[in-house]
Amino acid sequence: PAKALRLAAIGAVMLGAGAAFAYAAGWLGETRLTPQRIIDTFEAQAGHYPGYRKNHAKGLCVSGYFQPSGQAASLSTARAFSQPRVPVIGRFAIGGANPFAPDTGIPVRSLAIELSTDVGQVWRTGMNNPPVLAVSTPQAFYEQVLAGAPDPATGKRDPGRLQAFSAAHPESGAFRQWAAGYKPSNSFASTQYHSINAFRLIDASGAAHPVPWQLEPQTAFAALPAQVHDK
C-alpha cells in the first residue's frame, strides 16, 4: 500500500506538471492568447500568404554600414561603438500582413537592422516611425488588432469597436495623437525611426544606461504627394 501511494503521488505530480506545461503552451482552453492565435487573426483579416512575414509583410532589404561618432563609447563597451565601420543589413517595411498592400495605405513604417562587429558581437533592433507604441502587452496588441478588423458587411472599420478599445486602453492616446498629425514622407530614406524598446548599455565601470535607438535621416523631408501611383 505504501509503495502504491508513493507511485500515485509521483503520478499526480507528473500529471500536474504535464497539465501546467500544456496550459503554458496554450494547448488547454480557447481563451489563452498564443502566438498562433495572433497569427491566425492576421491571416483572417489579410489573407494567407505563404512565404511572407505575418506582419510587416511588404518590404525591401538594404545593406550598408554603421559609422559610430565615438560619443556613445562612454556609455557602453560594446564594439559597435568603437569599431570604425560596422557592416549592416536591414529591411524597410510597412505595417500589416498583406504583402501586396499599397505603400500609402498604412502609416506605420519600420526598419529592422542587424549590426555585425569584427569580434563576433551582433546587435539587432526593430524600429518604427511612430515614437510610441499604442499598447505595451501582447494581449492589448491582440485586442487592438481585433478592434481594427474591417466589418464583413461594410469592409470598413467599426468606429464603435475602435472607440471601445480606446476607452479600455487610454495609454494608446499618445499613439492616436501622433497618427492624427502624421505627415508621411515620400521615401523610406527620409523617414525617422524609433526603437520599440530600450537597450541596456553597460559602461566600463559596470553601470547600466537604458538607451533607445533613434535614426534621423540625412535625406531631406519631402511630403508624399496626394496622388501616388502605387506599384
Set out the residue ranges of the language-model regions.
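Active-site-adjacent core segments of small-molecule enzymes
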Residues: 1-231
